[in-house]
Structures are given as structure tokens and as C-alpha cells.
């Protein structure tokens, strides 16, 4: 058993899903008579479905229940990813190198299980452990998702490399005590003590000791 593990975020980190979410959110808000912009989407980056629904309800021009809005949104995004899910550059290659290095690895996402399962079915990506919004009482930026992933994978958080693309995800992983590698997608993420920031998954390498910046 390896002494270290790798914990991957999903949306924006492994898959280029933010344009897909923007498409689905825009369609839902059009049904509710309200505009939706990229600035609105940035407010929700790395957050939970409940947070998205609350934000969208506040902007809606027509009445709708939270459950109905959530159902519309999840139906739209799930149908979209079943057709095609664009991977981020280097995602499949990094996962393959993590597997070859014998590193246990988990997927840690704020998305619902229905969406996560659709993404995994579409991409064929495989993980030793899966943690989604359905598995926790508090999602990112709370540390619970990463604490649960570390527990399930059997490696202390301090020995887990957490790869994230959003400020909420980085906050979650750092609060859990993980070694954070940030790969910003939509929102910039600055350097901080103990945090590695790279431009792309292509800038990372995996070996038996974990994940590091290529050339570093």
C-alpha cells in the first residue's frame, strides 16, 4: 500500500464542464424569464447544487420550487454529459501515470451522484474511491469531502495530494490538511504556503512519491 494518495476534483479540473454548466444554467434561467451570465456562473464555481439552486431562485423572474429548479438543472446537465464530456488537457494521461505509479486515487466532487455517474460512464475514468455531494452533510468549501476521501482511501490527509481548480475546492482541501495543487480554470488562484499552483495538468507528473510539478 502506498504511503500517499491523490484526490482529484472533477468539474473544471478533470473535465471541461464549466461551459456545459453555463449552457444548462442559461437554459433553466431562460425558462424562468431571467438572464444568466458567466459572472453568475463564477459565483457558483466549486459549490453545491443547493447553493446553485438558491442563487438561481433569487434571480428568477417566475415562481418555481427549489426541487423543480434542481430537477430541471440536473436533467439538462446530465443529458448533456451523456452525449460528450470534454476532458481537460492531460487529464487522462495524469490519471494513467498515477495508476502506473501505484498511487491510490479518489474522485472528490461537489456534484450529485447522478451527474458524477454520468460523467464516469461517458469518459471511462476510474477511481479507487468516489466521494460526491450525496456522501457528505457539508460540501466544499467545508473540509468534510476531503476528510471522508482520506478516511476511505486509508491515507492521512497530510499525505494526500489534492488537485483542485476552484477557490472553494482549495479551501476545502487545505482545511482538511491535504497537500494542495491548484490548477485554476475560471477563477484565478494565487500562491500560498504549502500550495503548488500550475497552469495545466500537463505541468504535473506522478511517481511513487506522489504528484509534483514537472521540472520541479
Which residues are covered by each model-predicted region?
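Active-site neighborhood of HAD-like aspartate-dependent phosphohydrolases
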Residues: 1-42
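Short beta->alpha linker loops
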Residues: 44, 48, 72, 86-90, ...
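Metal-dependent phosphoesterase signature
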Residues: 35, 56-93, 101
Amino acid at each position: 500500500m502506498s504511503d500517499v494518495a491523490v484526490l482529484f476534483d472533477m468539474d473544471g479540473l478533470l473535465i471541461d464542464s464549466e461551459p456545459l454548466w453555463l449552457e444548462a444554467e442559461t437554459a433553466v434561467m431562460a425558462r424562468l424569464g431571467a438572464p444568466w451570465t458567466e459572472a453568475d456562473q463564477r459565483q457558483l464555481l466549486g459549490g453545491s447544487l443547493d447553493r446553485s439552486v438558491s442563487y438561481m431562485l433569487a434571480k428568477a423572474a417566475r415562481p418555481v420550487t427549489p426541487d423543480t429548479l434542481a430537477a430541471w438543472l440536473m436533467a439538462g446537465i446530465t443529458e448533456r454529459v451523456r452525449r460528450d464530456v470534454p476532458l481537460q488537457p492531460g487529464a487522462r494521461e495524469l490519471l494513467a501515470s498515477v495508476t502506473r505509479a501505484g498511487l491510490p486515487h479518489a474522485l472528490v466532487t461537489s456534484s450529485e451522484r447522478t451527474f458524477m455517474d454520468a460523467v464516469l460512464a461517458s469518459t471511462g475514468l476510474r477511481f479507487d474511491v468516489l466521494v460526491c455531494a450525496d456522501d457528505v452533510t457539508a460540501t466544499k468549501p467545508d473540509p468534510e469531502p476531503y476528510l471522508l476521501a482520506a478516511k476511505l482511501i486509508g491515507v492521512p490527509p497530510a499525505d494526500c495530494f489534492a488537485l483542485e481548480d476552484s477557490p472553494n475546492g482549495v479551501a476545502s482541501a487545505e482545511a482538511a490538511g491535504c497537500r494542495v495543487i491548484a490548477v485554476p480554470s475560471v477563477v484565478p488562484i494565487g500562491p500560498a504556503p504549502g500550495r503548488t499552483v500550475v497552469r495545466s495538468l500537463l505541468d504535473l507528473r506522478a511517481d511513487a512519491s506522489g504528484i509534483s510539478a514537472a521540472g520541479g
